[in-house]
Amino acid sequence: MRIFVIALTLLFGWLQYTLWFGKNGVSDYYTVEDEIEVQQQVNSKLQARNNEMFAEIDDLRQGLDAIEERARHELGLVKDGETFYRIVDEEEH
């Protein structure tokens, strides 16, 4: 019986050691948890940067569209290959 208790104590000690210090143990868990937190911060910064770039792209696209629309309506400009038709109300003449 004494050998059995010693064997169980050794087994329990080995299990505790592997739990706290072994591969995929508690120390590895905390290390990975810290790495995840750092990576999430990096991802947040990159996501914010991407959102800013998408907003800038949308502004540039809409800006060009707005400039083109203004040139068409106010200045009567047309693109190559297009034909411009102006419909005039009879009341204006």
From Swiss-Prot:
Gene Ontology CC terms: cell division site; cell septum; plasma membrane
Chain ranges on the Cytoplasmic side, renumbered to this chain: 1-3
Keywords linked to the UniProt accession: Cell cycle, Cell division, Cell inner membrane, Cell membrane, Coiled coil, Membrane, Transmembrane, Transmembrane helix
Subunit description: Part of a complex composed of FtsB, FtsL and FtsQ.
Organism: Vibrio campbellii (strain ATCC BAA-1116)
UniProt keyword annotation of Endoplasmic reticulum present: no
Lineage: Bacteria, Pseudomonadati, Pseudomonadota, Gammaproteobacteria, Vibrionales
Residue ranges of the TM segments: 4-21
GO biological process per UniProt: FtsZ-dependent cytokinesis
Name of the protein: Cell division protein FtsB
Side of membrane Periplasmic, spans: 22-93
Annotated family: Belongs to the FtsB family.
Subcellular location: Cell inner membrane
Pfam families cross-referenced by the UniProt entry: DivIC
Ranges in coiled-coil conformation: 31-75
Role noted for this protein: Essential cell division protein. May link together the upstream cell division proteins, which are predominantly cytoplasmic, with the downstream cell division proteins, which are predominantly periplasmic.
Keyword Coiled coil listed: yes
Major site of localization recorded for this protein: membrane
Protein topology in the membrane: Single-pass type II membrane protein
